[in-house]
Swiss-Prot record:
The chain crosses the membrane at residues 30-50. Disulfide bonds: none annotated. Residues 10-30 form a coiled coil. This is Single-pass membrane and coiled-coil domain-containing protein 4 homolog. Pfam families: DUF4519 (PF15012). Residues 1-20 are annotated as: Disordered.
Length: 59
C-alpha cells in the first residue's frame, strides 16, 4: 500500500455516479463543438484547393 495517494479521498458511490455523468456531458459538448469545427475547416480547405486548381478558360 505504499503507492497509494493518501491525500486523495475515496469517492462515494453517489460521487462516482455524478462524476461519470459530468464526464459524459463534457464529452457530448466536445463532440458538439469539435465535429462542426473540423467539418468547417475541411470544407474551407477543399474550397481553397478547388479554387486554386480549377481549369481557367480564357475569353
Amino acid at each position: 500500500m505504499a503507492g497509494r495517494n493518501k491525500a486523495k479521498p475515496r469517492l462515494s458511490k453517489k460521487e462516482k455516479e455524478e462524476r461519470r455523468k459530468d464526464m459524459a456531458e463534457v464529452q457530448e459538448k466536445v463532440f458538439s463543438v469539435v465535429v462542426p469545427v473540423v467539418v468547417a475547416f475541411t470544407v474551407v480547405i477543399m474550397l481553397i484547393v478547388y479554387l486554386k486548381t480549377r481549369p481557367r478558360t480564357d475569353f
